[in-house]
Swiss-Prot record:
Name under which the protein is recorded: Phosphoglycerate kinase
Organism of derivation: Bifidobacterium longum subsp. infantis (strain ATCC 15697 / DSM 20088 / JCM 1222 / NCTC 11817 / S12)
Involved pathway(s): Carbohydrate degradation; glycolysis; pyruvate from D-glyceraldehyde 3-phosphate: step 2/5
Gene Ontology molecular-function annotations: ADP binding; ATP binding; phosphoglycerate kinase activity
Gene: pgk
InterPro entries: Phosphoglycerate_kinase, Phosphoglycerate_kinase_CS, Phosphoglycerate_kinase_N, Phosphoglycerate_kinase_sf
Amino acid sequence: MKTLKDLGDLKGKRVLVRADFNVPLDGTTITDDGRIKAALPTIKTLREEGAKVILMAHLGRPKGKVVPELSLAPVAARLGELLGTNVPLAKDTYGEDAQAKVAAMNDGDVVLLENVRFNPEETSKDADERAAYAKKIAALGEAFVSDGFGVVHRAQGSNYDVAADLPAAAGLLVEKEVKALSKATENPERPFTVVLGGSKVSDKLGVIENLLDKANRLVIGGGMVFTFLKAKGYEVGTSLLEEDQLEKVKGYIETAEKNGVELVLPTDVVVNAGFPAGDTPVAPEVVAADAIPADKMGLDIGPESQKLFHDKIVDSKTVVWNGPMGVFEVPEFAAGTKAVAQGLVDATAAGAFTIVGGGDSASAVRNLGFPEDGFSHISTGGGASLEFLEGKELPGLKVLE
């Protein structure tokens, strides 16, 4: 994989950078700027080298139309604050305003192009259409840096096709992500523990399949665990259940046994009369995992399981965690996710290499107040880190070889 140093001297050069600025917004307020901060090392390095830094990114799913609420204006403002410099936002991605703003740049300046997904060609399935569009963007720059790890699993105009038109390299964030995830999957120090949560088993099938012959231990919580409990013959009440995955999950339980992989499931769960919505009062109670009442829904792992999961994580040299253990946004159902996060922090302090897979787990550790430096690596890619852990070839990385 080519990296920044492969691009040579960048002084005075116009460098297009595909970043991942797909941040959560409340109106125009950014509620978690983790992805913006993650892009700063690459931006600062390019500025120090005297490059003209042209940033591009997407926000939300405007589906090829201009949606004012999904403008990157809040991102430009936040970037300006973090960099201590003005970051102008072009009104378009490659049109007149983008061209004019780029033409006016001095060495070390930063410009942000408007949301790439305002253009239908960005995510087009037609390769020729995407390539023609990418050429228009590429005309703005003289080199391309791919630093949006959150989109490397997609072949899209601004991260895949542009790389074919310009000298291309991975930015510091993508390089760091690939190093960290490779360290965990290629030659992990053992015991190697994988902790999986989140609502759906179907989202994690590939990861389970790929890691069943690599991990020493698979720890499972979150909504997806009820399909495992059901596969073991337990009743799960009104908990989330993917009936169509039961046979697959039974197969995983058998394979784990055959491969000598320790499969750790909760022994107790926190249940409630239903999913906590709006202002409905919650009445959580703890029940054994094999005794969930017919009218109750499991929403977190119980106290006994919290200790069990924590101890299994601490007894590891490499830990990869993807997906919360419960509905962590509701305080009554956050303890499981906290216990796992604390387990990773304690394991890291004891010398283990720990990765928090992006998406919900990354937001959870930030929202629950854990220090970012308590973990070896917090990934910025949800789907991308999952596909990397599945052992898939990622198009946005392949073009940088």
